[in-house]
Amino acid sequence: MQKPINENFFIAQIGRTVGLWGDLKLHLHTDFPEQFKVGNSYQSNRGELTISDINFKRGTIRFQGYESIDAAKKLTNTKLYADEAQTKEQCPLEEGQHFWFNVIGCTVNQGDELLGVVDDIQRLADVDYLSIKTDKALVDTGLPKNFLVPYIDRYVINTDEKSKIVHVKDAKDILEAS
């Protein structure tokens, strides 16, 4: 059974047609372009699409059943999605890397103190920021309800996916200055 699109991750958008053979511009919204390979299938707002050709140098993609310019035009502005299992299978991580969906929902601790819970991750320029919903006990003392912490070694000590805890240092200073 196919998952609803809202349970999947938006990974790319299809642009205009290029040439006469059904090539389309590919606009990536993922950190893992290597997941796009001939034969891989992805969900879209137009149903399942299977890659028949991909050219990263030109930034183009072609799908099975859409090998003419007229057929391919129907896919302009189509969004491509991958589910969690597909993402984990096709996107190998290096040591110390984590998928955003594994970090969102983690508690954020500085030493023994609970600062809050990661409710989103935002990318500003080339840096990922943990958007943290501040713990109620800290909000009650007059601190902000939300704050951002750069996901860099300066602030993040480690992320324990099994325990769902992000250990940080100096993040409370950011919270207090927010």
Curated annotation (Swiss-Prot):
Claim: Chaperone is one of the keywords in the record: yes
A Pfam family it matches: PRC_RimM
Keyword terms, alphabetized: Chaperone, Cytoplasm, Ribosome biogenesis, rRNA processing
Record's GO cellular component terms: cytoplasm; ribosome
Domain of life from the UniProt record: Bacteria
Subcellular location: Cytoplasm
Oligomeric and partner information: Binds ribosomal protein uS19.
Family, as annotated: Belongs to the RimM family.
PANTHER family cross-referenced by the UniProt entry: RIBOSOME MATURATION FACTOR RIMM
Purpose: An accessory protein needed during the final step in the assembly of 30S ribosomal subunit, possibly for assembly of the head region. Essential for efficient processing of 16S rRNA. May be needed both before and after RbfA during the maturation of 16S rRNA. It has affinity for free ribosomal 30S subunits but not for 70S ribosomes.
Name recorded for this polypeptide: Ribosome maturation factor RimM
The species this protein was found in: Sulfurovum sp. (strain NBC37-1)
